[in-house]
Structure formats: structure tokens, C-alpha cells
Swiss-Prot record:
The keyword Lipid metabolism does not apply. This is U4/U6.U5 small nuclear ribonucleoprotein component snu23. SUPFAM superfamilies: beta-beta-alpha zinc fingers (SSF57667). It is found in: Cytoplasm, Cytoskeleton, Microtubule organizing center, Spindle pole body; Nucleus.
Length: 173
């Protein structure tokens, strides 16, 4: 009997078994409960104890309001003790380190398929092209507006010119 394997109270209880794990290999899914409705008790919003709005740990009976504190809790000694989990760090060999460094070097040199390579010059050039297209659209809109606007014709034009009236409407020309 060692410190991680205390004696069992009843012979076949899985609750008392120690789980030995290494580092996390899977990602923690923070979005699994997004857009789900949960009914909470009346006093659920006060404190960390008990079920409430946020991430709930059944082993520790605590609720966490943000993902950072939830992740900290999952790695805390309190949670690991309650879930009877022992994390053993495996020391990497020289070959594994070299292999991992080679993998990341290849990742840096080869951009992912289907994604554009980051180029500042291209982005600036594209931005200027979009600005020019926007200016051209504005100019076309202004020309179309002037074509379609009603003009004074005949004698009324002369009379308006004598009176100093050039147009009706806004002062922006």
C-alpha cells in the first residue's frame, strides 16, 4: 500500500481507483454547452459552491464563471485529488525532441495547403485597389445622380439665374 493507493472500503469500488495519466493529449472543449438551456436553482449565482451558471465540476461541486479559472481548476491539486488522478511526467528522449523540432521546422517552412501565405505587400496592394474601386463607385454614383436630377428648362432657367437661384435642396454641391 503506497500513498496513491489507499485501502479500499468495499472490494470492487471503481471510485477509489487511481488513474495515472501523462500530459493532456486531447483539447478541452469549452464550447460544448454553447446555445444550451439549463435550469438553475434560485441562489445559483452566488459563490462557487454548487451548481450555477458556468462550468460545473461534479467531483468538486464547484462552478466556475470563466474558462481560465475552469482550466486552472482542472489542473489544480484539489481537483486531481478528488478525481484520484496522478499525473506522471514522462521525460522526453533526445530522438523525440529532434523529431518534434523537425516537425515544427517543416510546419514553418511549408504553409498549410489551402491557406494564403502572409504577404504584407500583397495585402497593402489589395487595400489600395479596394480604395480606388470605392472612389470609382462614388464617382459613378454622383454622375448618375446628376444625370437623373430634374433641371429647370426654358424661361424658368433665365428667371432663376436673374434671381440668383441655381438649385433647390442641399448646400453641398
Amino acid at each position: 500500500m503506497d500513498r496513491y493507493n489507499p485501502p479500499r472500503r468495499n472490494g470492487n469500488s471503481k471510485k477509489n481507483e487511481v488513474v495515472i495519466t501523462g500530459g493532456r493529449t486531447q483539447r478541452i472543449d469549452f464550447e460544448k454547452d454553447v446555445n444550451k438551456t439549463t435550469i438553475l436553482p434560485a441562489g445559483a449565482s452566488v459563490g462557487r459552491r454548487g451548481r450555477g451558471a458556468g462550468w460545473y465540476c461534479e467531483a468538486c461541486n464547484e462552478t466556475y464563471k470563466d474558462s481560465l479559472s475552469w482550466l486552472d481548476h482542472l489542473n489544480s491539486t484539489q481537483h486531481l485529488r478528488k478525481t484520484r488522478t496522478v499525473i506522471i511526467e514522462k521525460r522526453a528522449t533526445l530522438e523525440e525532441v529532434k523529431e518534434r523540432m523537425e516537425y515544427w521546422r517543416r510546419q514553418l517552412l511549408e504553409p498549410e495547403k489551402g491557406s494564403e501565405e502572409y504577404s504584407l505587400k500583397e495585402r497593402v496592394e489589395r487595400y489600395h485597389q479596394e480604395l480606388e474601386a470605392k472612389k470609382l463607385r462614388r464617382k459613378q454614383k454622383k454622375v448618375n445622380k446628376e444625370k437623373n436630377s430634374p433641371r429647370l428648362v426654358g424661361e424658368n432657367t433665365e428667371l432663376a439665374a436673374i434671381m440668383g437661384i441655381s438649385s433647390f435642396g442641399s448646400t453641398n454641391l
